[in-house]
Amino acid sequence: MNDAIHVQGLNKTFSHKSALVDLALSIQPGEMVALIGASGSGKSTLLRHLAGLACCDRSNGGQVQVLGREVQSSGRLNSQVRRLRADIGYIFQQFNLVNRLSVLDNVLLGCLGRMPRWRGSLALFNREEKQRAMAALDRVGLADLATQRASTLSGGQQQRVAIARALTQRAEVILADEPIASLDPESARRVMEILADINRSDGKTVVVTLHQVDYAVRYCPRAVALKGGRIHFDGLAQDLSKQFLNDLYGADADASLMITERSRRVRQKPRLELAKV
């Protein structure tokens, strides 16, 4: 079986400062993986390289493959990277919605990677695409807000719209960059439950960067910890120890980063019953 994600010897430097150092990582199809680490550890930088939104160093830059296809190698993006991105759903921390558009129109933007540019530029979505977008909104519990402007939604609702957009895109790999960083606990729980359900029910590969270790343990079987652009842990999330986390986060290893005993004892199963799109 081919890896869903394969990274080999990835290096990235910003102004002579190493952000990623000879990084190697393989993720199997259908895995749900948490990337953890302090701010500046390289989590978001790695995610952007997986999606072809950033380019590695030209000298000894390394290689990134997604779904068996090369995204970039030695500082050069694949010339067909736009087509590759159709299979990679990217969920941003700040939602990346168009505030003036309706919720439904934002979700329909997920169709753009699989339709002719002329039709996309004219926003000519067919009936099947609109039905798919509505089904995605129904799955995340927002179908009744389809005609509402995106700017009127709460942060948690906007993040669910972003997830619905990835579902409409029919992405095989979903990359979520700090999707719950700015959300209240209840909204964060719901977003993580939706992502976990997509992974479990649809078999999608999900990679999520998280600052909250307890969420990583609760929802992600596997955790990869980064520090200084290097991988310092790759294994079962439940095996993360408090001593390791203290070393990983240093002065930032406060109570909000520590694993709760409840999370350690049992990974909570998502409580939402979500229909497939």
Swiss-Prot record:
> What pairs make up the disulfide bonds?
none
Keywords for this entry?
ATP-binding, Cell inner membrane, Cell membrane, Membrane, Nucleotide-binding, Phosphonate transport, Translocase, Transport
GO molecular-function terms, A-Z: ABC-type phosphonate transporter activity; ATP binding; ATP hydrolysis activity
Q: Which GO terms describe its cellular component?
A: plasma membrane
Reactions catalysed according to its record:
phosphonate(out) + ATP + H2O = phosphonate(in) + ADP + phosphate + H(+)
EC number of this enzyme: 7.3.2.2
Residues binding ATP: 37-44
Membrane topology field = Peripheral membrane protein
Question: Which InterPro entries would you find in this protein's record?
Answer: AAA+_ATPase, ABC_transporter-like_ATP-bd, ABC_transporter-like_CS, ABC_transpr_PhnC, MetN_ABC_transporter-like, P-loop_NTPase
Q: Look at the named UniProt entry and state the broad enzyme category this protein falls under.
A: translocase
Compartments where located:
Cell inner membrane
List, for all copies, the residue spans of the domain called ABC transporter: 5-253
Q: Which PANTHER family match?
A: AMINO ACID IMPORT ATP-BINDING PROTEIN, PHOSPHONATES IMPORT ATP-BINDING PROTEIN PHNC
Known partners and oligomeric status: The complex is composed of two ATP-binding proteins (PhnC), two transmembrane proteins (PhnE) and a solute-binding protein (PhnD).
Q: What family is reported?
A: Belongs to the ABC transporter superfamily. Phosphonates importer (TC 3.A.1.9.1) family.
**Name of the featured protein:** Phosphonates import ATP-binding protein PhnC 2
Q: Which organism is it from?
A: Pseudomonas savastanoi pv. phaseolicola (strain 1448A / Race 6) (Pseudomonas syringae pv. phaseolicola (strain 1448A / Race 6))
Taxonomic placement: Bacteria, Pseudomonadati, Pseudomonadota, Gammaproteobacteria, Pseudomonadales
